[in-house]
Curated annotation (Swiss-Prot):
UniProt xrefs under Pfam families: MFS_2
UniProt subcellular location: Cell membrane
Organism from which the protein derives: Mus musculus (Mouse)
Residue ranges annotated as Cytoplasmic topological domain: 44-55, 119-126, 180-191, 293-305, 351-358, 430-468
GO cellular component: a single term: plasma membrane
Keywords: Cell membrane, Glycoprotein, Membrane, Transmembrane, Transmembrane helix
Protein name, entry field: Transmembrane protein 180
Length: 519
């Protein structure tokens, strides 16, 4: 009995499109979470300062260690398979395992997202538990989704093709930020709560449907062609020998860490990426503050809200342009160019000063857009590091999720250090403590101050605060760009070296990567 036409049409979608659509269901939740979770607990649930910082400190630790923990639990059998009855894991088995994991963890992510918007415990306890639950499921989803990027394709061209669809669907998901403005109301929270229920339901059902579709496509490909996946150039592949066997030995976590410590490109990359993660979250945390203190006299509230919203969508759209450049010039050259652009724009803004509203508006928006866009390109670099790790250590299978987790272990602290260092620098330079000063009319919703405002600062302090915000705005990207240009210059996995690694991985893996059905 034949399939009805909608089902047949869905099964006929390219795997690259189905894979990319998974980013939509994460994006519609995560952008709303980033924009409103602090304001919800500070302004609606009235969390106190001590509980806020305790929650953020525990979150820092959990956020750093859950990536390598989940990566190790997911991929340790790929480092040294312990086969049962002589059977191990093929490439197809690894991909199907990751798809099934996304089918479970995606809906759980949606449920943990809902837990933020209904008060069900004391504010401090709920803040801590919600952050840890949400970040745990987000980590599981991100690890398996990113690992599939390395497992589904080998060539840089095909990985940028996959990333293209991720950026496209992430941009669509970012539109939830614009929709949220129609429902956000601190005094009457019920409409925003209902909006979040709709988002969570759509995300959870989307994960269930898309992972089932991806699973059926992979299984149908094997039945139809007698191979574990589609070959990128349309050829037919053979089922590769399973992972495991008499030559596979047990690799402990300590041995794996020693292998990473000898992986020079990995070390230089995580040093650069730590700065990048810090800068991305610094921009997210202080974007509303910069709009408020540098531009509030020159732009309307609606213009500020529009700039805030567009800054979530534009990085994904920007990548639709940069990814073709990556296919032509390579990711290394494009990322280096973005670092140089960041440095040049920051120096230009420093020379121009804070009294040019149009230039300030462009710089604040472009700084966030280009920085976020660079973060999304770096996923492609990690997939190349996965290849190099496999070649250097002669693995049977690429431990993709584990390597993504180890990258996050080193770089994610930048996510928490960004607001801590930013508020400290502002307080050190201007004497303005965000936890003690009265908030002005908000342009956005990211507000890490408590519910009890102190008296407004004297008018004489205002110019100092404005000057402090301006110097923070320009000197942070200048410092980040200089550090990144140095570390990136030491990174050698590009050009001839990258081509050699790709060729060696093909030989080691007997070209057993799954194919993507191209558009």
């Amino acid at each position: 009995m034949g399939l009805d036409w909608p089902q047949a049409w869905l099964l006929g979608l390219p795997i690259a499109v189905v894979y990319g659509s998974l980013a939509l269901f994460t994006s519609i939740l995560h952008n709303v979470f980033l924009l409103y979770y602090v304001d919800t607990f500070v302004s609606v649930y009235k969390i106190n300062k001590v509980s806020f910082w305790v929650g953020e400190t525990v979150f820092l630790l959990w956020n750093s260690f859950n990536d390598p923990l989940f990566g190790w639990l997911s991929d340790r059998q790929l480092l040294s398979s312990q086969p049962r009855s002589g059977a191990g894991l093929s490439s197809r088995d690894v991909v199907l395992t990751r798809v099934r994991a996304l089918g479970w963890h995606g809906p759980l992510l949606a449920l943990s997202f809902l837990a933020f918007w209904v008060p069900w415990a004391p504010a401090g306890l709920q803040f801590l538990l919600c952050l840890c639950l949400y970040d745990g499921f987000l980590t599981l989803v991100d690890l398996h989704h990113h690992a599939l990027l390395a497992d589904l394709a080998l060539s840089s061209h095909d990985r940028t093709h996959l990333n293209f669809y991720c950026s496209l669907f992430s941009a669509a998901g970012s539109l939830s930020v614009f929709a949220s403005y129609a429902f956000w109301n601190k005094e009457d929270f019920s409409s925003f709560r209902a909006f979040c229920v709709v988002l969570a339901a759509g995300s959870g059902l989307g994960f269930l449907g898309t992972t089932q579709l991806l699973k059926r496509q992979i299984e149908a490909t094997r039945r139809d062609r007698g191979c574990p996946g589609l070959d990128l150039d349309g050829g037919v592949c053979e089922e590769e020998p399973p992972v495991g066997g008499e030559e596979a030995g047990n690799i402990t976590l300590g041995q794996y860490l020693r292998q990473l410590a000898r992986h020079q490109n990995f070390l230089w990359f995580v040093g650069m990426d730590l700065v990048q993660v810090f800068h991305c979250h610094f921009n997210s945390n202080f974007f509303p503050l910069f709009l408020e203190h540098l531009l509030s006299d020159h732009i309307s509230l609606s213009t500020g809200s529009f700039l805030l919203g567009i800054s979530y969508v534009a990085p994904h759209l920007n990548n639709l342009y940069f990814l073709p450049l990556c296919r032509r010039w390579g990711v290394y050259a494009v990322v280096r160019g973005l670092f140089l652009l960041k440095l040049s724009l920051s120096l230009l803004m420093l020379l121009a000063g804070p009294d040019h509203p149009g230039l300030l508006c462009f710089f604040i928006a472009s700084n966030r857009v280009f920085t976020e866009g660079t973060c999304k390109l770096l996923t492609l670099v990690v997939t190349d590091l996965v290849d190099e790790d496999l070649v250097l250590n002669h693995r049977k299978q690429a431990a993709s999720a584990l390597l993504f987790g180890m990258v996050a272990l080193v770089t994610k602290p930048g996510q928490t250090f960004a607001p801590l260092l930013g508020t400290w620098l502002l307080c050190f330079y201007t004497g303005h403590d965000l936890f003690q000063q009265s908030p002005m009319t908000p342009v956005g919703s990211v507000r890490p101050w408590p519910e009890l405002p102190a008296p407004a600062p004297a008018p004489a302090q205002a110019p100092t605060l404005r000057q402090g915000c301006f110097y923070l705005l320009v000197f942070v990207p200048i410092t980040c760009a200089l550090l990144q240009l140095f570390t990136w210059s030491q990174f050698t996995l590009h050009g001839r070296r990258l081509r050699t690694v790709k060729a060696q991985r093909q030989n080691l893996a007997q070209i057993h990567t799954l194919n993507i059905k191209m558009v």
